[in-house]
Amino acid sequence: MSTILQAIGIHAAWDKVPVLLDAHADFAQGQWTCIVGPNGAGKTSLLKVLAGLMPAQGEVLLHGQKLQSLSSRQRATQLAWLGQQASGSDDLSVFDVVMLGRLPHQTWWTGATDEDRAVVENLLASMQLTEWRHRSLGTLSGGERQRVLLARALAVQAPVLLMDEPIANVDAPHQADWLATVQQLTQTGTTVVSVLHDLNLALRADQVLVMQAGRVVLQAAPSDPALHACLQQVFDHRLSFHQVQQHWVALLV
């Protein structure tokens, strides 16, 4: 598969404290990569640099072009973002919040098109949000808000979707729905990069990227024995890895 997004020699700091140290990563078209690591490893920082939301040294390449050379509209249509906090405009209806995802495709003189409205309607239906369409975002629970904000990110229809802890406040049934959505996206060619704390969910990805102390330690497939050894070292736990129904799981020993 061709590489669509690259991080090359990324260095970044927060309040003059280094958070990324010579980070390198490649993300292939149509693959889901999950970033894991202990607290403070630099996971969210790397994701923000990939999205162009955090200044850094080094290069981020999107379709082989430097991210910094792209216009804000180009970045907004090519990279969809779902942050860790379920933030949004509380007074807006669910329909209008999801429609915000179409803004990068609109111009001030045309506004929302029939195509934009069709995209939003299809997302509301597929994500079982239709009955909430007129409810304001502020009336929803944290997990419900996160589902709506995921729909907003999907409305961008970007080739790359970046998500930071997207299911932290979502119950188990909707976690399964989220996983099915991610798998459907990758099957249609979308590149998905997510940060997750749940290691067994992370092992459902095509690639797992392990971080520690601001560095990318390893990027490998869930079946790779080198990844299993790396995860035990980084998390400082003895783990046993088993394949269950074509998926890998990690158990504490």
Annotate each predicted stretch with a short phrase.
Residues 136-140, 144:
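Conserved ABC ATPase signature
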Residues 161-165:
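Catalytic Walker B motif of ABC-type/P-loop ATPase nucleotide-binding domains
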Residues 99, 114-132:
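Conserved ABC ATPase "signature" region
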Residues 51:
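Helix-to-loop junction immediately C-terminal to a conserved catalytic motif
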Residues 232-253:
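ABC ATPase nucleotide-binding domains
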Residues 58-66, 75:
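Conserved ABC transporter NBD signature motif
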Residues 205-222:
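H-loop (His-switch) and adjacent beta-strand-loop-beta switch element
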